[in-house]
Design a protein with these regions (language model features):
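Amphipathic alpha-helical scaffolding segments comprising HEAT/armadillo-like alpha-solenoid repeats
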Residues: 1-6, 25-41, 63-75, 97-110, ...
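N-terminal "cap/leader" segments of large eukaryotic alpha-helical scaffolds
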Residues: 1-17
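Short inter-helical turns and helix N-cap capping residues of alpha-solenoid HEAT/ARM repeat scaffolds
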Residues: 10-12, 42-47, 78-82, 112-114, ...
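Structural detector for internal amphipathic alpha-helices that build alpha-solenoid repeat scaffolds
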Residues: 13-28, 48-64, 82-97, 117-130, ...
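General structural signal for secondary-structure boundaries
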Residues: 14, 31, 133, 182, ...
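Residue-level signal for functionally critical sites in structured catalytic/ligand-binding pockets
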Residues: 81-84, 105-108, 115-118, 139
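Terminal, low-structured helical/coil segments at or just beyond the last alpha-helical repeat
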Residues: 179-208
Length: 208
C-alpha cells in the first residue's frame, strides 16, 4: 500500500499524484483511502483536478461500494462541470461492472446537466456497451438535442462518446450516427467517423 500516506495527507498535490498512480496501475485495495481523500478534496471547490483523478481511480479499480456515496455527491451544488462529468462516468462505469445497467444513464439524460450526460455517455463507450436498438434510439433522441450540441469542436459533446462506441454497433445504427455527425464537418469528429467506419476504436475520447 505505497500511496496511503499521500492519500491521507490532506495535501492536494500529493493526493492527486497518488490518485494518478493508482489509476495508471489500476491498483486494488485503496477504496477506503480514495473515499477519505475524495471527502477532503470535495471541500475544496478549486480542486477539480484531484477530484477527477480520485473519481477515475475509484472507477478503474472497481470500488462498486462507493456508488451510493458518489450519487450523494451529485446532489451537491458543485462549481466545476468537470466534477459532474467525472462523477457521472464513475457511477455509470461502476454500475456496469458485471452486468449491463443503464438506469443511471437514463437518470442523467433526464437531468438536463450537460456534464452529467457526457459522463454517463462516456461510460457507455469505455465499458464497450453494445446498445440494443431501443436503447440506441432513445439515447440518440436525447444527445442530438440542440442543447447537447453547443460548442461543437470546443468541448466533448455527449453524442461523441456514442459515436466513438459505434464501431461495436450493428451497421444500421452505426451508419445512423455517422450520418448525423457528418453535418458538423469538424476535424475531431471526422477523425472519429473514420475510425468507426473502419470498425475500430481510435481511443480519441477516453477519459481514463
Amino acid at each position: 500500500m505505497d500511496y496511503v500516506d499521500e492519500l491521507t495527507s490532506g495535501r492536494t498535490p500529493l493526493v492527486k499524484k497518488a490518485a494518478k498512480k493508482i489509476l495508471k496501475g489500476k491498483l486494488k485495495g485503496y477504496g477506503p483511502f480514495l473515499h477519505q481523500a475524495l471527502e477532503g478534496e470535495m471541500e475544496k471547490p478549486k480542486s477539480w483536478e484531484s477530484q477527477m483523478y480520485l473519481l477515475y481511480a475509484i472507477a478503474a479499480t472497481d470500488c462498486t461500494e462507493e456508488v451510493p456515496y458518489l450519487k450523494s455527491l451529485l446532489l451537491r451544488d458543485i462549481p466545476t462541470p468537470v466534477t459532474y462529468r467525472s462523477l457521472a462516468v464513475a457511477i455509470a462505469y461502476l454500475e456496469n461492472s458485471e452486468t449491463e445497467n443503464l438506469s443511471f444513464v437514463y437518470e442523467s439524460l433526464e437531468s438536463n446537466n450537460f456534464s452529467q450526460v457526457a459522463g454517463a455517455c462516456a461510460a457507455i463507450y469505455m465499458k464497450k456497451i453494445v446498445l440494443k436498438d431501443d436503447d440506441f434510439n432513445k439515447i440518440m433522441s436525447y444527445v442530438t438535442q440542440p442543447k447537447y450540441l453547443e460548442h461543437i469542436g470546443q468541448v466533448i459533446n455527449p453524442f461523441l462518446f456514442i459515436l466513438a462506441a459505434s464501431y461495436l454497433y450493428p451497421e444500421q445504427n452505426r451508419q445512423k450516427i455517422v450520418d448525423f455527425s457528418r453535418q458538423f464537418n469538424e476535424v475531431h469528429i471526422n477523425t472519429i467517423i473514420d475510425d468507426v467506419s473502419k470498425g475500430k476504436d481510435g481511443r480519441r475520447v477516453r477519459l481514463f
